[in-house]
């Protein structure tokens, strides 16, 4: 019995879930609803869930940033809201990978993309 590509994708390839934590999740919606990512979502290959870091912010104003340690220009993301969000997500399911984005991190390339494609649940 021959199966369609849609059937194979839906029933034999496990769905991947990517949770993205962002200070501005609305800015992420548009690029994630077009092109290859849109088709992957429509075919049930990937589920992408955006999380607003401000929901985990500190104090009355839900603060997620702080001044740079040691002075200097700019702001940095506080660790408490990030850890609170990640811990909540980890309580809901098992994650294969948690990726912390930083300016001096590893370059995302095809090799990294291939390795991540083998993971089922990822937090970025």
Residue ranges and their predicted role:
Residues 15-90:
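N-terminal nucleotide/polyanion-binding subdomain common to many enzyme families
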Residues 76-124:
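S-adenosyl-L-methionine/SAH cofactor-binding core of RNA-modifying enzymes
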């Amino acid at each position: 019995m021959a199966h369609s590509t849609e059937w194979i994708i839906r029933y034999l390839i496990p769905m991947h879930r990517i949770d993205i934590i962002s200070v501005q999740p609305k800015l992420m919606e548009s690029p994630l609803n077009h092109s290859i990512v849109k088709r992957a979502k429509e075919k049930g290959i990937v589920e992408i869930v955006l999380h607003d870091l401000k929901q985990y912010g500190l104090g009355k104003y839900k603060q997620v940033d702080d001044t740079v340690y040691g002075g200097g220009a700019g702001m940095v993301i506080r660790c408490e809201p990030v850890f609170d969000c990640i811990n909540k997500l980890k309580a809901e399911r098992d994650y294969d990978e948690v990726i912390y984005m930083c300016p001096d991190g590893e370059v995302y390339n095809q090799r990294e993309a291939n390795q991540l494609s083998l993971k089922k649940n990822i937090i970025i």
